[in-house]
């Protein structure tokens, strides 16, 4: 199986293709990307027959920015008979996957696929039973086995394949299902909530998103991102010349500072989180974020980089490389991840965590 399908936001297929071509090439897994505008997915076809599996095993999924999900597939199954779509699909997967842990019957995230998505949900139950009978799926769901993917691109046309549960998105179609909180000041709140789900393992939330932490929200008005921090019982400095939602101020957890986010300097030394969603050139935001991290003004940060109209992948890569270079220059170990989230539009969300290690019997960030 030499093809890898990558799901992405419709309209960002070229960026997704540029990224996978670049990062696969760095690992000497060569091939070419098939791109159809606004399709919501890209097919990366490797030149060597087993390189699809090698790619999804060796390249960390967390290193990808524009892909929501990926899986290796075989040839396209076409003209599935309406009276029996199951048998050809089972036949394609037998000998490819054994005792898979989960089945996902998916489509691309486009308006055209909405009707097809309804079919996929109904089709999943009988297909799962047939795949279990054939030994393709285990008799119970388990996160320790590969995920079986059936990806429909049109009625009666699908790709079949798999991904590794240790190196994929845990979410169906790569999209966390989040509900907009009725009391949140703006829909942007979902960006930060999704970022927490994508970047921070669930079993680390209690430690890294803990009650009583101090946080800073730069460019906070009206408070969509501050809302997520308050919800987790943090104390928040919300920095913006624009007003904050009264509902947030009434909690007593928010201090509103009428200042420019680019000029604000924290006075506390125990700030755990800094978040930032400002409409500004990405290079300017990246420079500010690097300054916060180098100076140790926060332990972790999540921020958005607005994308230009052209060369988006190159621009994001350049900004991330700048931040990495600044950290390296000052001897700071950090983990950097970036992803175009489902709730992002012309932007990507970046997470940087300074790594704390025991040095000479004390906790130290370096």
From Swiss-Prot:
Gene3D superfamilies: 3.30.2300.20, 3.30.70.2810, Vaccinia Virus protein VP39. One of its GO terms (biological process) is methylation. InterPro entries: RlmM_FDX, RlmM_THUMP-like, RNA_MeTrfase_FtsJ_dom, rRNA_MeTrfase_M, SAM-dependent_MTases_sf. The active site is at residue 306. Its EC number is 2.1.1.186. Its main location: cytoplasm. One of its GO terms (cellular component) is cytoplasm. NCBIfam families: PRK11760.1. Monomer. One of its GO terms (molecular function) is S-adenosylmethionine-dependent methyltransferase activity. This is Ribosomal RNA large subunit methyltransferase M. Catalyzes the 2'-O-methylation at nucleotide C2498 in 23S rRNA. Keywords: Cytoplasm, Methyltransferase, rRNA processing, S-adenosyl-L-methionine, Transferase. It is found in: Cytoplasm. S-adenosyl-L-methionine binds at residues 188, 221-224, 240, 260, 277.
């Amino acid at each position: 199986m030499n093809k890898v399908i990558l799901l992405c936001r419709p309209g960002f297929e070229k960026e997704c293709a540029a990224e996978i071509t670049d990062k696969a090439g760095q690992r000497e897994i060569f091939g070419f990307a098939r791109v159809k505008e606004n399709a919501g997915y890209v097919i990366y076809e490797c030149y060597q027959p087993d390189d699809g599996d090698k790619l999804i095993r060796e390249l960390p999924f967390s290193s990808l920015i524009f892909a929501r999900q990926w899986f290796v597939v075989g040839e396209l199954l076409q003209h599935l008979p309406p009276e029996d779509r199951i048998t050809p699909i089972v036949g394609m997967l037998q000998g490819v996957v054994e005792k898979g842990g989960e089945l996902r019957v998916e489509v691309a995230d486009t308006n055209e696929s909405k009707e097809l998505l309804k079919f996929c949900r109904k089709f999943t139950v009988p297909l799962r039973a047939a795949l279990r009978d054939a030994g393709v799926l285990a008799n119970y769901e388990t996160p320790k086995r590969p995920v079986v993917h059936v990806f429909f691109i049109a009625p009666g046309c699908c790709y079949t394949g798999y991904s590794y549960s240790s190196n994929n998105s845990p979410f169906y179609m790569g999209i966390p299902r989040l509900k907009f909180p009725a009391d949140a000041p703006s829909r942007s709140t979902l960006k930060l909530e999704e970022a927490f789900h994508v970047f921070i393992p669930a079993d680390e939330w209690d430690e890294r998103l803990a009650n009583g932490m101090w946080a800073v929200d730069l460019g906070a008005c009206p408070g969509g991102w501050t809302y997520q921090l308050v919800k987790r019982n943090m104390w928040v400095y919300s920095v913006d010349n624009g007003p904050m939602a009264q509902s947030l101020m009434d909690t007593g957890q928010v201090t509103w500072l009428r200042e420019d986010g680019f000029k604000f300097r924290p006075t506390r030394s125990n700030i755990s989180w800094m978040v930032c969603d400002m409409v500004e050139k990405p290079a300017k935001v990246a420079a500010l974020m690097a300054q916060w991290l180098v100076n140790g003004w926060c332990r972790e940060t999540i921020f958005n980089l607005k994308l230009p109209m052209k060369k988006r992948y190159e621009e994001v890569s350049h900004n991330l490389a700048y931040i990495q270079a600044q950290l390296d220059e000052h001897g700071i170990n950090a983990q950097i991840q970036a992803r175009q989230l489902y709730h992002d539009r012309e932007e990507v969300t970046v997470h940087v965590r300074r790594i704390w290690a025991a040095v000479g019997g004390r906790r130290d960030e370096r």
